Amino acid sequence: GYRLPLDERVLADTDTLFVFGLDHLLTEQEASSDEIEAVRDWLGREGTCLVLGPHHDVGISLDMKERAMEYAHHGDALVPRQQRFGKYTRSLMAGLGVPVENRYGLRPGVVAGTSRIAPLTAYRDLDTRGWLDGVTNFSFHKHLPHYAVTTDDTSAIKVLGTQPIDMSKPHPFTEAGNREFNSFVWMPPGGARAGEILMADSTVFSTLFGADDSLKQFWTNLATAK
């Protein structure tokens, strides 16, 4: 393959841009200053929407017992005790001033007696754009990131959806008292940025992990937003 930077060739006729973070941190991929500037300029155009989806960050702790706990929690033998994703997306977020970090790989809860993912806790009073209209749940995946908000400025960024966690096996995040993780985040236009920024995991946009009417409605909401 070869490197194709984000520039006017990609952005000139684009309204909605998806940037998913499935690059391992070990590959040390980062957005260049030119790419960050190009995306910032693009977001200055009204009607644009940037969807960011850095994947999980499993095993950040140096404590091997914590890593073992995370591994047992998500229950996926294919994922090692340390698997960290998204340096490119993280660098783009830092350059654009997105105050969010992708943390952990958390197993979502399911509807009792089924394998269906538990419904989202949707904060519809904050969802003035209707991103989650008609949406009750995303798709099940064994290890999903918590999108930790790193600012107290609630006008700049809004958590619109949180996901209940599978509590059957412990995790450092649940041991700290958490029962849900941030799964859908929205940054409304602000300052010189006329466009919007959304954060949802890349698995939400793949049929590989199932696609029911709720998920299809979410895709429709994004595709038809004006």
Please report, for each region that a protein language model flagged, where it lies by residue.
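Short, surface-exposed patches at the edges or C-terminal ends of soluble domains, predominantly
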Residues: 1-226
